[in-house]
Amino acid sequence: LGRFSDACVYGRASRLGRVVRPRPELPGDDWVRVEVLLCGICGSDLGNVSYKSSPAMEPFGSFPAILGHEILGRVAEVGPGVVHVAPGDRVVIDPMLHCEVRGWEEKAWCPSCVAGLHSTCELSGEEGAPAGDAHPMRDADGHVAADRGPGVGLELGRPLAPGLTIGYHRDLAGGWGEEMIAHRRQVFTVPHDVPDRVAVLTEPLSIGVHGVLRSGALRSPGPILVIGSGAIAFGTIWALRTLGYEGRLVAQAKRPHEVELAAALGADETITPGDEARQALIDTGARAYMPVVGPEVYAGGGFDLVFDCVGNQPSLAQSIGFATARGQIVVLGCAGQIRKLDLTFLWAKELRLQGYVGYGAEEWEGRRVHTFEVALARMRDDPRALGGLVTHVYPLEQYRDALRSAYDHRRSGAVKVALQP
């Protein structure tokens, strides 16, 4: 119903509501109980609440669920298998529920998790493993591959429900609450000199870091264009600069405060959609042509790499039109069902279209590390204007006001809205 009325997103007609649940107990030795300090509201949360997201991901979640996956907290309790954090430590949470979190022995992990790319875990649509259960992976004939080994299990009394992330999971609460639990592999210590309002951005900033490192953007001759004015777009601008990209960087945003943020984070040029964007493209050497029917098209010039951090029809159409021949388009926005998208120049310019999701194992400075570790280190050493991204913080009980600010960001001026228990 959110498609038809904003009241169904943040008003009394919304299906969201406050509930009282018992304090979460640790389900195993490798688990951590966390008191939530701040939790961001993500665009994917708004898309799901309003039912404007594609239903294609529905099998990879389980409901009812406590939302929230951009989590900053303080450790309250650790199991005996946890040695890298202690009660009192500030931590951020990787929300992905990969094979190890779901209770499987290493020999049973899916190929993505074996490679450290757990954001594409191939078993997130399956139940987890109570101790001693057979693995759910099936062979080509549909038979359970029993030789995959038993699960190490969780003490839930039943299998862990399907679901890709904390925040969209029936059994593991997200950060829109006072406390939550997470597996030790999901928990990362925050440096002492990173303030809370910056640390809570670790998850969305890591998406930008992951996209920059995986796409080869640091080797691009440029120019690079970043489209979008949300946390992921700003995180991508910051990631490009803090990780070492020195070429020309153009950022497209809509409102004055967003344009200022993009410049403060490292954009050489900031543009708004429409005439300014067109002129920026022409300045690269592109030539404009007008077909008999349809919008203006371009040849020559263009951007070597376009980061689309929106993922809708206008942004994808612009990305295809603005990319140079044999250029690359990286989609970091949660693109879903796109209607009336003309793909002519995808093939006519031999473009590469690549999507990235989440975070995982990265090659950085000669080491293999988690994206969160890269992001946290750079946040400590190069915070730039990151403190300006969290524009609104609401007490948890004012969640309706928080959702209104995030959903109607054009009026509120919100970039990132966070809840504080």
Go through each PLM region and give its residues.
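C-terminal substrate-binding/catalytic core of Rossmann-like NAD(P)-dependent dehydrogenases/reductases
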Residues: 282, 287-296, 300, 339-391, ...
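Glycine-rich beta-strand-centered segment in the early N-terminal region that forms part
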Residues: 22-39, 54-115, 147, 191-193
